[in-house]
């Protein structure tokens, strides 16, 4: 698929925050490393979708800075980007402090915060 054909949809920040909170809470309450790893797989897919939307908007704005639609989208992501970063940092801390960290690192790699 060509870049120009990639569909763009603005994220629903309310839904994004709800999903981050759910993932973080479920990770904290996981009863095993396997359970945390499965939640991490969900997290990875979820954040990839969020990041794709953000990147599409930013790149399309950079390609044509006169496009008002993508200028507004870029402004939106400039606003919500720090909020998303806070959730990602919080999730990273939960993994770092996990009692199953050794298991997760055997599946993923070293966990840094």
Regions flagged by a language model, labelled:
Residues 9-20:
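Short amphipathic alpha-helical heptad-repeat segments
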Residues 28-37, 93-95:
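Charged, low-complexity interaction regions
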Residues 33-45, 70-71:
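Short, charged, amphipathic alpha-helical segments
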Residues 45-62, 76-95:
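Amphipathic alpha-helical coiled-coil segments
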Residues 64-76, 89-108:
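Long amphipathic alpha-helical coiled-coil segments
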Residues 111-113:
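Conserved small/polar residues in nucleotide/adenosyl-binding loops
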């Amino acid at each position: 698929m060509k870049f120009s054909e990639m569909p763009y949809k603005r994220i629903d920040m309310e839904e994004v925050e709800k999903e981050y909170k759910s993932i973080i809470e479920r990770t904290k309450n996981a009863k095993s490393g396997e359970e945390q790893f499965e939640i991490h797989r969900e997290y990875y897919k979820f954040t990839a979708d969020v990041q794709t939307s953000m990147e599409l908007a930013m790149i399309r704005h950079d390609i044509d800075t006169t496009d008002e639609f993508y200028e507004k989208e870029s402004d939106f992501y400039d606003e919500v980007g720090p909020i998303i970063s806070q959730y990602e940092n919080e999730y990273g801390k939960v993994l770092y402090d996990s009692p199953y960290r050794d298991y997760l690192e055997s599946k993923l790699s070293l966990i840094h915060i």
